[in-house]
Amino acid sequence: METKTPAKKATVKKTASSKTQTKTQAKIPAKKNAAKELKDLFEDSLKDIYWAEKALTKALPKMHKNATDKKLQSAIELHLAETHVHVKRLEECFASLGKKAQAKKCDAMQGLLDEGKGIMEETEPGAVRDAGIIAAAQKVEHYEIATYGTLAAYAKVLKEKTCLKNLLATLNEEKICDKLLSKVADITLNSKAIKK
């Protein structure tokens, strides 16, 4: 039986490491309909967040129904009303670009909504589930904040004034909602979720 010398072991490790690096550093080929300009990326990203907002109009009522804390229920109601406004603003943005509002499945939002559903399934109704709902809702908020911030930056560079105005208004509301959820969690919910 052959024993591997330190030099042979190092060669084997180096070869395996080289293969891993090659795979992780591989270039991803662009699809046929890939964005070629910032305007294309902007429009594609608008379709993505449009889908996300429309999906939220269906998911938020489920969160509301499963929440037990009155302040959390109120925060979800407010966010649902704002989400309908966000959909309208996105439709205005598409119209200002001369495009029909079109949704493209947002895998990130789908993942966040699936995770939120999972949290509700894995927690008993009450304070613990409410704390989980807040965590799931804030992950959604953070995704939306990142997306609207990026889209506003694109709109500014592209000189799309109507879109910029609408995107900044929505971005501001998403930040306020995130702070409201933090306040609800900090004031009552997280401490109620501790079993005494």
Predicted features along the sequence, with ranges:
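Amphipathic alpha-helical hairpins
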Residues: 2-196
